[in-house]
């Protein structure tokens, strides 16, 4: 359900933003994109969703706390917008999970592995510790 506005010439800002992020996700799904680009698109999608919730959804929730019948500047109902956003985000998250699994499988097939620290050998642990101490920590404030 797309929230109704007083003037239907306008598109709901939040749903439009989610449509843009859907296009980012579609780039991650495209098998003709290089694998490293597909990983980047997954990261961009994830970062965008984090910001969307921190800013857009939080603002809608605050508006709803102030006035349960509040509307946006263009007349979209805040409650209806939140309902529509929740439904769309659920769809996008399912699609993201499938894309993530597909990209990670493609990485394994390309012999690219991302290890967490519990999978490191002793030599890898020593290398990572030494690298951090001498190359990274010196640049941290």
Short names for language-model regions:
Residues 1-141:
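N-terminal localization/anchoring segments of enzymes in phospholipid and broader phosphate metabolism
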């Amino acid at each position: 359900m797309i929230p109704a506005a007083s003037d239907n010439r306008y598109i709901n800002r939040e749903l439009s933003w989610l449509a843009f992020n859907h296009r980012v996700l579609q780039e991650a799904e495209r098998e003709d994109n290089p694998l490293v680009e597909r990983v980047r698109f997954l990261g961009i999608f994830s970062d965008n969703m984090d910001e969307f919730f921190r800013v857009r959804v939080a603002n809608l929730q605050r508006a709803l706390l102030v006035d349960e019948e509040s509307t946006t500047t263009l007349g979209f109902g805040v409650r209806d917008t939140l309902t529509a956003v929740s439904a769309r985000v659920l769809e996008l998250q399912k699609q993201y999970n499938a894309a993530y699994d597909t990209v990670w499988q493609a990485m394994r097939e390309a012999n690219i592995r991302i290890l967490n620290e519990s999978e490191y050998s002793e030599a890898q642990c020593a290398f990572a510790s030494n690298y951090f101490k001498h190359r990274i920590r010196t640049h941290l404030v």
